[in-house]
Amino acid sequence: MTSTDLLVIGAGLSGVAAAVAAQQAGAKVQVVDRGRAIGGRMASRRLRDTGTAFDGRVVDYGASYFTARDPDFVAIVETMIEQGVVRPWTDTFHVHNEGAMSGVRTGPVRYAAPGGLRTVVEHLAQGLSEIETETHIEELAIEPGGLRGGNHQATWAALCMPQPQAARMLPAENLPNTDLTWEPVIAVTLVFENKTWLELDGVFVNDDPVITWIADDGKRRGDDAPVLVAHVNPVFAAGHLEDPSGVLPQAIAATRRVLEIDELPAWTWAHRWSLARPISGNDEPYWLHPDLPLGLAGDAWAGGPRVEAAWLSGRALGRAMAAELH
């Protein structure tokens, strides 16, 4: 049994931000995550057994990109650009309406990572010494003087995850009464032998029953590889959460139709995100229980849902808990 000041459950961006902020304030921090690697929905993987020349290449299958508005987050992003971790990607995406490309939409600069968005979280976590992956906390027990989760005891606990996941560890009365709802997404990766589609970075696909978004991962990564990632419509995805691969025929057909691709992909893969994103965000930066030493952070807070909101929320919660500890 280990003992620590702060147990951070969830090693996505908000969890890492919380841990870093608390550690910088002098707290002893332990981070645990059920996944094989840190990053959460900032998820990347290496392609394997595709039958193409692109095995070993990284693809993002979680968050597609991120933006930066807060001055502190902007400063961190600029530093990561200088270090080669992050690259400005684009400020313009195409729009597909009523069966045809209808123009482009320009907005804030979207940032990507040559090594995959997971490397952003890994970079920010470099100063954390106590990170434990493949650790599933089934129950967070309230004990005199703190909490216990699995083999870890702590004075405080930060749950950096979607609230429905936190509800599996704690009774409902120990969590905030919010009306936030989450929608699922199935991310479909398509690897082609050659790139034959229109030069673009991504496409917002409106009013389509199958897909809502297509990212050109070659443009995102900067190597121009013929790799696409399509996000399945949440309503369609909800019917296939137990069998994500079941969306592949329709998702492949829809992607080829939108981008006018004649050839079939050489390799495809579907990944389920049951809690992909909150439909709206809470303006509060985080939540602290009024009586118990626990709190919540993530991209449903700090005005989310955005990647930046996850970082802002986690940092704010980590600082608040460190202040309570000292």
Where are these regions (language model features)?
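Short beta-strand to alpha-helix junction loop
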Residues: 65-69, 94, 98-123, 241-250
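Flavin (FAD/FMN) cofactor-binding core of flavoprotein oxidoreductases
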Residues: 249, 254-292, 302
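Short hydrophobic core segments
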Residues: 7-9, 32, 152-166, 314
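Central helical "cap/lid" subdomain
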Residues: 39, 55-56, 154-201, 261-263
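A conserved short coil-to-beta-strand element within the FAD-binding core of flavoproteins
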Residues: 133-147
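Glycine-rich FAD pyrophosphate-binding loop
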Residues: 7, 23-54
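N-terminal FAD cofactor-binding segment of flavoenzymes
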Residues: 21, 43-93
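Active-site substrate-recognition segment that forms the wall
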Residues: 189-241, 250-259
